[in-house]
Every structure is written in structure tokens, then in C-alpha cells.
Amino acid sequence: MAAAALKRMRGPAQAKLLPGSAIQALVGLARPLVLALLLVSAALSSVVSRTDSPSPTVLNSHISTPNVNALTHENQTKPSISQISTTLPPTMSTEKSGGASVAPHPSPTPLSQEEADNNEDPSIEEEDLLMLNSSPSTAKDTLDNGDYGEPDYDWTTGPRDDDESDDTLEENRGYVEIEQSVKSFKMPSSNIEEEDSHFFFHLIIFAFCIAVVYITYHNKRKIFLLVQSRKWRDGLCSKTVEYHRLDQNVNEAMPSLKITNDYTF
């Protein structure tokens, strides 16, 4: 009886404990789900930031290229001015040798040139850059010839150049002819295709004739016997022979016999 009473008391207590345990289980499941969602959101934000980050670098690269070009052109213009300044003293020496009383002008120092370049307007610098971009080759040629005293390059073609050009033209023609011949082999004309089709048809007929001859040669005895049997039948069943019924024309068939009523045994 006591055991039964204890079981009855435990039943309601367990029923009360079941909702609390279910709530704890749900809370335990919700925590890892929340952590997983946080990790996924952090990963997505990092990926988006990585994909968005290269765009400003590309823009900076596009923006920085003109500045680099401008700096290179400025660096090219500065040595040209210094080189021009170095070529000025010989002209003054020639004037002195001629006897003319002209006061020598001092050559500008590099510091004064840099200050003058810095004081110049940006519009003038842009015009100089445009002029250098329009004709860089002529400026370089003049500077090179002035520095080293080399003669101008003769752009006229010589006989050797003409021979080389003729050789290259002949080689190109040879390559073109070879390519055309290869194309003609690869892509035959319609006439060749028609001839091929006729040849195939004639080949089939020739093979059929060879098969007939082979069969007749190996079966010539049978064919000969068949022909002879047909001739024998034609001889027996010829249209020239007339057949008569024996019961009507017995006298004609056997004239030695006579119809008599006397029979001998």
C-alpha cells in the first residue's frame, strides 16, 4: 500500500517537471542556432567588403596614370632646357672671336631654372606638354643631333632594301600559292564530286558482273544439265508430234493386230 501511495505521489510531480525540462531543451537548441546565424552574417559581411574594396584601387590606378604621364613629360622637358643652356656658350665665343664688343650673358643656373618653372602658370605647362606629345620624335632627333653631332638619318631606300622587299614579296607569293593549292585539295569542285559519284556507280555494276561470272563458272555443270533436260523435254513435248488415243486408233498404232472375237491362250 505504501508503494502504491508513493507511485501516485510521483506521478503528479513528474507531470509538473516535464514542461520545465522541455523549456530547457528548447533554450539549449536556440543558443547554437543564434551562434551559427552570427557566424554566417560575419562571413557574409567580410565577403562583401572584399568584393567592394578593389573598386577604389582601380579608380586610383586610372586616376594616377595621367599624373604619372605628366610627371614623365615634365622630367623630359627639364633636361631639354638644361641641354639648350649648355649649347649657348659656344655662340658667345664666336662673337668674341669676331671682335664684336658684346657683354657675355651669364648662363642660368639650375636653381633659377627650377624657380622659373615653379613660377610659370599651369596653363603654359599644359601647352608645353601638348606640344611635346604632338611631336616627341622631332624634338628627340634635334636634341640627339645637337648633343652628339651625328648626321641626320637618311630615310631613302637603297638597292639592298629594294632587293629585300622583292624577296619578301616573292616568299609571300609562294606561301599564298601553297595555301591555295592546299585549299583546292581540301575543297574539291562540284565536277570532281560528280565524277566520283559516277565512278562509284560503275564500280557497283562491275562488281555485280564479276559475281555473276563467278557463280556461272562454278555451277556450269548444273547449268549444262538443266539446259539438256529442257531440250529433252522440248523434244518429247514438241508441237510437231500428234498424239492419238490408243483405244480409238489401235489399228494405226499396231497394224499386225486385228480385232477378232477369237482369242488364243
UniProtKB/Swiss-Prot annotation:
Regions of this protein lying in the Extracellular compartment: 50-196
Matching entries from Pfam families are given as: KCT2
Q: What is its main location?
A: membrane
Cytoplasmic compartment spans: 218-265
Q: Where in the cell is it found?
A: Membrane
* Annotated GO CC locations: membrane
| Glycosylation: residue positions | N75
Segments of skewed composition (Acidic residues): 114-123
What residue spans carry the Polar residues bias annotation? Answer: 72-96
Q: What InterPro entries does this protein's entry cite? A: KCT2 (IPR037645)
Q: Which domain of life is it from?
A: Eukaryota
Which stretches does the entry tag as region Disordered?
A: 72-123, 135-168
| Keywords from the named record | Glycoprotein, Membrane, Phosphoprotein, Signal, Transmembrane, Transmembrane helix
Q: Which residues form the signal peptide?
A: 1-49
Transmembrane domains' residue ranges: 197-217
Modified sites of kind Phosphoserine:
S229, S256
Topological type in the membrane: Single-pass type I membrane protein
Q: What is this protein called?
A: Keratinocyte-associated transmembrane protein 2
Native source species: Pongo abelii (Sumatran orangutan)
Gene of origin? KCT2
